């Protein structure tokens, strides 16, 4: 019973379609055993919605076996008929085979079956994977209801799946997305209202679509009206999620009536519709109607005929007329419209009077497109406009700015071509017409995803400021572009302050009180291969052109909107997906609502709209009118057309100071003590505003971690977080710099024009090349600063020039000559950078100690040509703009220009011959800029786009090449259905696919099979109904030609067959007839394979779909080649090339394989070893060698051996070219099946002297891989040359003798030197020994005996006693008198005395010595003192 229960459980697990080892998506456990409401059956597939009957579940339980055992036993004892006996034998055999069969490790799902031979699942058409758990093909669904799913678990990488739901023509079908989780902006599910991708697109789902509530009203739902629906899913190779579970039904009310009504059949048609509950209206009962009876009779009245319900009395507003006028709290409302021309995204809107003008935008289908829309904010109705408003081509991602009843539209992406434009057009509201402006100075970037504002500067100029955006040629733009409305000119502003990073899809607002722009978020690239969303907030002051970094929001997003209400910037919606390798739950579409307090630099999160409807979106527009924000359109997988209205809290609704101060968040109110009124931020006085700022400053909390984010001095000191710069890093102001570092706390003190700071802000090669101080590093795809010493010591790189200021006192001509000595010339200060640098350097030099006593008025390269014309040394005219003449200048006496005091920025005219202090020299920078590759946007073919590197991506259906860091910015609404990189390009159209399987992998293709019954056909653009004819011309203007059904391209009457869901069973590629509908009878035309899809050995080509095979072209050096490419597998080592037409010259092989072969050149007297053991060597069966004798009077010996048998042929020729080209080789040796061979070739027999270029050829062939071969040629003499011997012998002997003499002499010198050193050390040692004097008494015979002391009469004593080590022995020295002559006089020449020494034993005499010493002490008083002496 336990086993049976386990079997039943395993069967049930297979029916569920997943096992416990398979990761189930979020939410499965809650739904996995939910009973089916309609049938009471069990639901084993939660995502699929499949219900199994109760009968089936009972059948899966094991039957009772005990009552049947006796019956079974009796049946076994009965004799079996022959047929039954044979069946039993067959069953036994099959049982034995089943015992040997392999079982699949995991159960097969989705209709797959386990193959007992391989132990692997065999999947039905459309399913792939080890368990058939992933979709991977096309499906056709015909039921009146059903489900669409990618399979259990996470979907597969690089997946393409297509579902065709076929119903009845023009019958309404509803698709309900119960679960959907894919990678945002990269993995899409497209829904078409028809039977092909050429039908109208109605949705492009991506990201995490999770209902905001548990109710049914927020789950996405798509309505299809044609009776057909095509769903196509594509995923890339980044990361995958749990996929989707979609149910469809032809008889279902919208959103199941949102749970607030009943679904009933319509009386007038066969459709169904909702009968809403009380207080609910709308097609799906999702609109509140007359809540709280509109507060009747005090606040309003219910209008049953109006979908809006309440008609509020004066002084009341909001849902149910529950909020007074002015509003004491904020609230949301929603207006829904069904006009097909309204849905759009990435449009722009402005308000003029009571009219909201909406211009441009992206739409799925352009049949009902209107370029300009007008919305009456008072009546909440859309207005009708003239058809002339559509005279401009469709675009999106542009900018709008309003000025005096004129709407200025700039940039954007042209939808029909995919190009980004730099057009500036003006829409005149009064006559509803467009005018194209042609600026005088065209120095602007073509951008998309930017913003623009028209402002009046303090100088009175009216300009349009274009902020950031993405340019396909220059990447993400970080500059501010200015258009002067009066001068009709463009310019790029040189801003100051923080170095900000521009991006795509940010929001920006202009605050009239602070005269500043506030820019938030966006999609940004921080290098060519690093990009992400941003949460930055920047402030740009329009008069000072100063950027300041404010507190970031910590909410990353792009394609959101912002407006300013009473000193508060309100931010709504956007795309918040910021995951790159795995999902962290960030959603594509957001309804986040945030507020930024301008005065306090503080963010707060506001409640999301509570509208009983999903309002998540991005790419919408937002405008402000009478403190009310209007949000229109956007994208949330579907294009939206509703209007969200947010009415903010009003300051004047608060009557007390406490309530006024506590107002918000979302509004900033100030209490006016004089009038005792609560006023908004815009109406506050300067004193009130400053007081508020000071209060906020005292309460603010600093985020010290933000300081670490700044990598340059400018951004570190131009922010609101109190940071300061310490040499090379930014730290909080309460952290001191370390010793030796300089602290910079103010922006003005930062070193200006440091290229290390701003080069890394450039994200493309072209933008990097615009600045001569930067260079592009192609390996790391980043912009880096040029080295500081590129100009040399003392020179400074400024732009593309090197400048140097000297202090020498000289006249103009000498200064010019001094510059020329450095290959320079006097500077032409024609750019702002040069002027600023020179003036700054002069100020620094003037303040330094070394030059403080000098008054520097340096010469510059400015001269007077005639009476009224001055020009620079580079011949450019002087314009008196960057530098200006001082008052009363130029004087008539001067013809040369000098700089006056640096603070004045002025010029003076001086006499050219007068010597003055200083000169400014200039020379070109001596570096060459690296050439940039062709920008991705200018590459028009896939091969060109993806060939060089991974920096570009090719979108196949859009036929566009984009930067890899701009894919999301280029296709924000899923326009790209499939992309390619790194040399992987598809055919340009369907006709390029040669097999049906490859054809049906493309969602827009179908297969037309010819009548030959061989599987031959053609791939054509088409739908389920048949082929379609593509338009012959591209879209022009706002006219988009659509493909039309053309069945004549595949006529069924002519026995052609159109396949759109599955391929025909016969797939023999036109090389064989099919038997049993699918088996190729005999592959002909040199083909082989299950479907005759490859060429036979020795032939190559593409035999698919009737293709031909041709012989391998290998020039006789190979018999096999790659069956697809034709690349030959050369059999001779040293021969290479696609057709074996080249020799490996780089490896010492030479020859001509077109007329002969290749040979390895051997050196004489060297042994060579060739090991052919690599996988690339498996086709080699031959190798050839060539050798030429070095000596003409010696024989040539050779030997060769190998690890395997081989054939050997040796020939010779009079020269190498003769042997390879004319065939004049003479055979010498021919051996077969040998392993070793030796031979000698006589110089006399082969006449080496008369054939100086004689060459021997060795042909080794017929061996097998792997093999090791050794070969050598050598020349040795038979008789030794005696003369040479003796010459060599004596030369060696004399050389050795000379070496020995030199060594002996060196040794003697070393010995003598060492001996001298030793003697010197001995003398020093002897001189350092202790010494003393001794008295000697010489007795003579005439001396009276009494004159000699008694002590001398004792035993003679030694003059020295030198103890040895251990005091056992000593050296005793005494005076000895030598024999004397007559008179006691020694002989002449002699002293008569000698010193005698002897080694004596003192071990036994030491006590006596000590005794004598003690006796001497006792006798000191008895005897007079005497000198120590010795008696001889």
From Swiss-Prot:
Glycosylation sites: 216, 240, 245, 256, 267, 303, 328, 365, 386, 419, 431, 578, 626, 734, 866, 917, 926, 989, 1046, 1057, 1076, 1201, 1209, 1253, 1262
Name by which UniProt lists this protein: Attractin
GO cellular component, one term: plasma membrane
Source organism: Rattus norvegicus
Domain C-type lectin per the UniProt entry, residue ranges: 798-922
Residues in CUB domain copies: 135-251
Annotated transmembrane regions: 1283-1303
Record carries keyword Cell membrane: yes
Laminin EGF-like domain location: 1066-1111, 1112-1160
Residue numbers on the Extracellular membrane side: 87-1282
Domain PSI: 706-751, 758-797, 935-986, 989-1064
């Amino acid at each position: 019973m336990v086993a049976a229960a386990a079997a039943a459980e395993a069967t049930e697990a297979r029916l569920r379609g997943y096992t416990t080892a398979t990761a189930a998506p979020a939410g499965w456990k809650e739904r996995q055993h939910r009973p089916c409401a309609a049938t009471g059956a069990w639901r084993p597939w939660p995502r699929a919605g499949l219900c199994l009957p109760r009968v089936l579940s009972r059948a899966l339980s094991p039957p009772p076996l005990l009552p049947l055992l006796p019956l079974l036993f009796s049946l076994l004892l009965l004799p079996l008929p022959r047929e039954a006996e044979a069946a039993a034998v067959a069953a036994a055999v099959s049982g034995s085979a089943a015992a040997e069969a392999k079982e699949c490790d995991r159960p097969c799902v989705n209709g797959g079956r386990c193959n007992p031979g391989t132990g692997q699942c065999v999947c039905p058409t459309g399913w792939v994977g080890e368990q058939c758990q992933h979709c991977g093909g096309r499906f056709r669904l015909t039921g009146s209801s059903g489900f669409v799913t990618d399979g259990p678990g996470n979907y597969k990488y690089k997946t393409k799946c297509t579902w065709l739901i076929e119903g009845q023509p023009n019958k309404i079908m509803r698709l309900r997305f119960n679960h959907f989780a894919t990678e945002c902006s990269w993995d899409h599910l497209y829904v078409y209202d028809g039977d092909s991708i050429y039908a109208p697109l109605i949705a492009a789902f991506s990201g995490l679509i999770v209902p905001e509530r548990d109710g049914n009203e927020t789950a996405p739902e798509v309505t299809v009206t044609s009776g057909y629906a095509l769903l196509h899913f594509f995923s890339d190779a980044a990361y995958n999620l749990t996929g989707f579970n979609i149910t469809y039904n032809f008889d279902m009310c919208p959103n199941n009536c949102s749970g607030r009504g009943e679904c009933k059949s319509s009386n007038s048609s066969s459709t169904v519709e909702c009968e809403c509950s009380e207080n609910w209206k709308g097609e799906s009962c999702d609109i509140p109607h007359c809540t709280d009876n509109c507060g009747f009779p005090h606040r309003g009245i219910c209008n049953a005929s109006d979908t809006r319900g309440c008609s509020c009395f004066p002084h009341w507003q909001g849902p149910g007329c529950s909020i007074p006028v002015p509003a004491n709290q904020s609230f949301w409302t929603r207006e829904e419209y069904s006009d097909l021309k309204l849905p759009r995204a990435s449009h722009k809107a402005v308000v003029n009077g009571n009219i909201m003008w909406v211009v441009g935008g992206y739409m799925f289908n352009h049949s009902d497109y209107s370029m300009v829309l007008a919305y009456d904010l008072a009546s909440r109705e859309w207005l009708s406009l003239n058809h002339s408003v559509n005279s401009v081509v469709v675009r999106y991602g542009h900018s709008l700015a309003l000025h005096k009843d004129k709407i200025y539209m700039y940039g954007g992406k042209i939808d029909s071509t995919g190009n980004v434009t730099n057009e500036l057009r003006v829409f005149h509201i009064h006559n509803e017409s467009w005018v194209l402006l042609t600026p005088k100075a065209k120095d602007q970037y073509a951008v998309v995803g930017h913003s623009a504002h028209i402002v009046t500067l303090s100088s009175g100029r009216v300009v349009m400021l274009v902020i950031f955006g993405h340019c396909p040629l220059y990447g993400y733009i970080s500059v501010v572009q200015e258009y002067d409305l009066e001068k009709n000119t463009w310019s790029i502003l040189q801003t100051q302050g923080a170095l900000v990073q521009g991006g795509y899809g940010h929001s920006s607002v202009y605050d009239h009180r602070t005269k500043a722009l506030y820019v938030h978020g966006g999609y940004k690239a921080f290098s060519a291969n690093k990009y992400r969303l941003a949460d930055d907030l920047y402030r740009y002051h329009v008069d000072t052109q100063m950027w300041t970094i404010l507190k970031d929001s910590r909410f990353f997003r792009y394609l959101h909107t912002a407006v300013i209400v009473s000193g508060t910037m309100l931010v709504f919606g956007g795309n918040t997906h910021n995951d790159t390798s795995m999902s962290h739950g960030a959603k594509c579409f957001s309804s986040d609502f945030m507020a930024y307090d301008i005065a306090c630099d503080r963010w707060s999160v506001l409640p999301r709209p509570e509208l009983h409807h999903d309002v998540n979106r991005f790419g919408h527009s937002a405008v402000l009118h009478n403190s009310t924000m209007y949000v229109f359109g956007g994208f949330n997988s579907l294009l939206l057309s509703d209007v969200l209205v947010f009415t903010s809290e009003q300051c004047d609704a608060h009557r007390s100071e406490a309530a006024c101060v506590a107002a918000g968040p979302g509004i900033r109110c100030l209490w006016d003590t004089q009038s005792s009124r609560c006023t908004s931020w815009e109406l506050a006085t300067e004193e009130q505003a400053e007081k508020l700022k000071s209060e906020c400053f005292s309460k603010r909390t600093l985020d010290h971690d933000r300081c670490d984010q700044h990598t340059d001095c400018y951004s570190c000191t131009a922010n609101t977080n109190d940071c300061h710069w310490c040499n090379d890093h930014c730290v909080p102001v309460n952290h001191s710099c370390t010793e030796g570092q300089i602290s910079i706390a103010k922006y003005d003190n930062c070193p200006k024009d440091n290229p290390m700071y701003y080069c890394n802000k450039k994200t493309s090669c072209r933008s990097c090349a615009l600045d001569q101080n930067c260079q592009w590093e192609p390996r790391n795809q980043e912009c880096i600063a040029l080295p500081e010493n590129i100009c040399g010591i003392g020179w400074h790189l400024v732009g593309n020039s090197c400048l140097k200021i000297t202090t020498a006192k000289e006249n103009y001509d000498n200064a010019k000559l001094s510059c020329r000595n450095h290959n320079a010339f006097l500077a032409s200060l024609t750019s702002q950078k040069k002027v600023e640098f020179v003036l700054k350097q002069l100020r620094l030099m003037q303040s330094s100690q070394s030059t403080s006593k000098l008054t520097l008025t340096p010469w510059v390269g400015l001269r007077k040509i005639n009476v009224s014309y001055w020009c620079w040394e580079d011949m450019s005219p002087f314009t008196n703009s960057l530098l200006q003449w001082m008052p009363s200048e130029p004087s008539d006496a001067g013809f040369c220009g000098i700089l006056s005091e640096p603070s004045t920025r002025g010029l003076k005219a001086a006499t050219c011959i007068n010597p003055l202090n200083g000169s400014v020299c200039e020379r070109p920078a001596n570096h060459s800029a690296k050439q940039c590759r062709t920008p991705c946007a200018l590459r028009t073919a896939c091969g060109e786009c993806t060939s060089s590197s991974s920096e570009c991506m090719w979108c196949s259906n859009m036929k566009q090449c984009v930067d890899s860091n701009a894919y999301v910015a280029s296709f924000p609404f899923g326009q790209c259905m499939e992309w390619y990189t790194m040399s992987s390009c598809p055919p340009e159209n369907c006709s390029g696919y040669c097999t049906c399987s490859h054809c049906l992998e493309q969602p827009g293709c179908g297969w037309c099979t010819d009548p030959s019954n061989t599987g031959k056909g053609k791939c054509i653009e088409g739908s389920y109904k048949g082929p379609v004819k593509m338009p012959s011309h591209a879209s022009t203007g706002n006219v988009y030609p659509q493909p039309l059904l053309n069945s004549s391209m595949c006529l069924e009457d002519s026995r052609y067959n159109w396949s759109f869901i599955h391929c025909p069973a016969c797939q023999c590629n036109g090389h064989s007839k099919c038997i049993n509908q699918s088996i190729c009878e005999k592959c002909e035309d040199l083909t082989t394979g299950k479907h005759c899809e490859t060429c036979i050995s020795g032939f190559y080509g593409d035999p698919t779909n009737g293709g031909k095979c041709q012989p391998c072209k290998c020039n006789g050096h190979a018999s096999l080649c790659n069956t697809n490419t034709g690349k030959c597998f050369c059999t001779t080592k040293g021969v290479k090339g696609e057709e074996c037409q080249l020799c490996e010259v780089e490896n010492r092989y030479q020859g001509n394989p077109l007329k002969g072969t290749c040979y390895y050149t051997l050196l004489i007297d060297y042994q060579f070893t060739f090991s052919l053991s690599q996988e690339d060597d498996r086709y080699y069966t031959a190798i050839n060698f060539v050798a030429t004798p070095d000596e003409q009077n010696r024989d040539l010996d050779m030997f060769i051996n190998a690890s395997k048998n081989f054939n050997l042929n040796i020939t010779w020729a009079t020269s190498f070219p003769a042997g390879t080209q004319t065939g004049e080789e003479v055979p010498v040796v021919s051996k077969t099946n040998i392993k070793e061979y030796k031979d000698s070739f006589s110089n006399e027999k082969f006449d080496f002297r008369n054939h100086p270029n004689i060459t021997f050829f060795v042909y080794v062939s017929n061996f097998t891989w792997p093999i090791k071969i050794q070969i050598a040629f050598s020349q040795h003499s038979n008789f030794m040359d005696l003369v040479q011997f003796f010459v060599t012998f004596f030369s060696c002997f004399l050389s050795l003798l000379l070496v020995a003499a030199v060594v002996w002499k060196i040794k003697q010198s070393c010995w003598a030197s060492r001996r001298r050193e030793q003697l010197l050390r001995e003398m020093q040692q002897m001189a350092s020994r202790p010494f003393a004097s001794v008295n000697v008494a010489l007795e003579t015979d005439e001396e009276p005996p009494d004159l000699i002391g008694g002590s001398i009469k004792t035993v003679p004593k030694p003059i020295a006693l030198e103890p040895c080590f251990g005091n056992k022995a000593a050296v005793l020295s005494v005076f000895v008198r030598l024999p004397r002559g007559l008179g006691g006089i020694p002989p002449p020449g002699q002293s008569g005395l000698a010193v005698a020494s002897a080694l004596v034993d003192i071990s036994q005499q030491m006590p006596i010595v000590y005794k004598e010493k003690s006796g001497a002490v006792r006798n000191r008083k008895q005897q007079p003192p005497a000198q120590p002496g010795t008696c001889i």
